[in-house]
A protein has these predicted regions:
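Structured, amphipathic secondary-structure segments that form assembly/contact surfaces
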Residues: 1-26, 30, 40, 46-183
Length: 183
């Protein structure tokens, strides 16, 4: 338990290696992961090459403006201002849970737990930044108009229609506690 420090041993049983994954589940999770990785990571060398295009080719009209505003020159919290060219934000996805796929229906959303770290390119070292939970709704628009380059990034017309990120307090490292020094 991360809060009390109590340790326990749990034994998993079952055959987890042969778990069947449907093609639809694999494609949905891959698209969700690609969007979150592109949207939440930052590297000055990749933002214009891949992250920007991937995010905007998958972001719907209600989602794209927030990403554009995040990287706007007028935003004092924009990643380039915070990290510059010498540091990058790396994303590690911990889990993806598809939502709304019960009863043979297609999933319409996902919850993604991920951790971010800041990578110092000069030193080659990473430092934990935070843990987050992204909640999204999505659909597929096969008739979505994309140029050939964007269609290669998003061949099935995956479209994120709603997107929200919150702090994941369950997996966040505990803050340091100060104890009074004995006299």
């Amino acid at each position: 338990d991360p809060y009390t420090g109590t340790a326990s041993v749990a034994r998993l049983s079952g055959n987890f290696q042969d778990r069947d994954v449907t093609t639809e589940e694999a494609i949905n999770k891959s698209n969700v992961a690609q969007f979150v990785l592109a949207r939440e990571s930052y590297d000055s060398g990749l933002i214009g090459q891949r992250n920007w295009r991937t995010t905007l080719s998958m972001a719907g009209p209600a989602v794209a403006p927030a990403y554009i505003a995040l990287h706007s020159e007028s935003n004092p919290e924009r990643p380039f201002r915070l990290y510059g060219g010498s540091r990058a934000v790396r994303v590690r996805i911990l889990s993806i849970v598809l939502i709304g796929g019960a009863g043979g229906k297609r999933p319409t959303g996902a919850t993604v737990r991920f951790q971010r770290s800041v990578y110092d390119k000069g030193r080659g070292a990473s430092q934990a930044l935070d843990s987050k939970i992204a909640t999204m709704e999505f659909t597929y628009s096969p008739d979505l108009r994309l140029n050939e380059e964007d269609r290669l990034l998003n061949p099935l017309g995956f479209r994120v229609t709603n997107y929200r990120v919150d702090d994941d307090f369950a997996s966040a490292p505990l803050p340091e506690r100060e104890f009074p020094t004995p006299p």
